Amino acid sequence: MSHYHIIGIAGAGMSAIAHLLLDQGHTVSGSDLTANHATAALQARGVQVWRGHDPAYVQGADVVLATAAIRGTHPELEAAAAAGIPRLSRADLWRLWSEQRPVIAIAGTHGKTTTTALTALALRGAGIRCGFLIGADVPALGGSAQWGDPEAPLVIEADEYDRVFLALTPALAIITNVEWDHPDVYPTPSEYTAAFAAFSRQVRDPRRLLVCADDPGALALAGQSEARLYGIDEHIATDPVSCRLAPLDWTASGVTGTATGQQFDLWYYDRRSFGRRLAATVTLAIPGEHNVRNATAALAAAALWGADLRTAVTALAEYRGSSRRFEWRGDVGGITVIDDYAHHPTEVQATLLAARQRYPDRRLIVYLQPHTFSRTRSLWDQWPAAFREAAVVLVGDIYPAREQGDPVALAQSLVDHLIAHGIPARYAGPSALAPSALLAVAQSGDVVLTLGAGDSDQVAAAFLEQCSAMSEER
């Protein structure tokens, strides 16, 4: 067994990897500029986590693990290089695990986290003790990552950022959708699409690639392979490349809302007998049409792996969501607060539609923390349509992540852009002032949604705290 030192261990991806390494019997230490619930969970398992970065932290390590974003001038990387300690990336570990055991990879611009969680839950519900690696905490699975039975598949949320998903050679894969994102890595839509095309070719058996037929970008990839198709309602899809008609292998139909979620019928098309049959009736406790697609993909993957659908469907009914994915944060003063990781216009729109489905008669007050300058600018024309369901949109300063720019000027420009397209928007300022901005507009009966991939979840927490304090004063 080896000692892995992880630089940036507080991040969702790296903290999940740390859990897998611990499950395999390795020793893990790590460092980060911040501490959070992820580092606390690792410390509870005996991991030494340092706040900040220092060359001394790599002493005794056999391997240093760091993301590509951490450059060679980092003090711990320099110390590791001087000591002859090898550096591995996330892609290196994924490649290794993909060689050690079968991998089910969930790729796509949107919906990866939920679909990965649902796939793992479906398999485990059917008695297959799969491992899983997810970029969020999933209470129904007991965390974000577990190694599971090494003979069973490892279900991985296959992130396309920095092309890391190309390190995998999956035994089975899902592509939920393909829509240009991460312009800092993929300057053009064609480069982004090309990466997904390369990923689809790495699936060991093209018949074990599941592609969403409802998404034009994903469906275009299916025309280049023998991929299986899934979607909602339509039983036939038209390939945008060849213009040929293709039957959907898995179809969700008859979607209806329930008091606690939604329900639909799952149909399967047998390519050998050319017959279609009802495979299951599925109940979900999570709202949104996008989650019907996510569940359909997960159940199709489980069925392809040989899982019993009846028990898989039962397991999905217990799923209540993942951290920062339409996560209920609390109710105070008649106001419901939901936090979501949505940071792409399509994700924002899907989240608001899910909120409208669950809360049909309530005003939706949205706080958006735009994530990165490059994404905000590159998807400029898509932002107004994303907020059609919102009563008020509060735009906070840009969360820069790894980029440089003026977070105030671009946020104010986005507000002007939204107003010009008929969206009632206003500038909310830095995240520290956002709770007060929300308090100024939210009223009893409203649903407040905090959206973004930065620290917008802290805005939700602070808003609830301020609301509670005001209620006590009254």
Swiss-Prot record:
Provide the alphabetized UniProt keywords.
ATP-binding, Cell cycle, Cell division, Cell shape, Cell wall biogenesis/degradation, Cytoplasm, Ligase, Nucleotide-binding, Peptidoglycan synthesis
Which residues of this UniProt protein bind ATP? 108-114
Example GO biological process: cell wall organization
| Top-level taxon of origin | Bacteria
Localisation per UniProt entry = Cytoplasm
Q: Pathway membership of this protein?
A: Cell wall biogenesis; peptidoglycan biosynthesis
Cellular component GO terms, alphabetical = cytoplasm
One Pfam match, by short name? Mur_ligase
Its UniProt entry gives the catalysed reaction(s) as: UDP-N-acetyl-alpha-D-muramate + L-alanine + ATP = UDP-N-acetyl-alpha-D-muramoyl-L-alanine + ADP + phosphate + H(+)
Molecular-function GO term, any one: ATP binding
Keyword Endoplasmic reticulum on entry: no
Q: Does the keyword Hydrolase apply?
A: no
Q: What is its EC number?
A: 6.3.2.8
Report the enzyme's class at the first EC level.
Answer: ligase
| Family under the similarity heading | Belongs to the MurCDEF family.
Primary role: Cell wall formation.
Concerning PANTHER family, the annotation shows: UDP-N-ACETYLMURAMATE--L-ALANINE LIGASE, UDP-N-ACETYLMURAMATE--L-ALANINE LIGASE-RELATED
Write down what this protein is called: UDP-N-acetylmuramate--L-alanine ligase
Which gene produces this protein?
Answer: murC
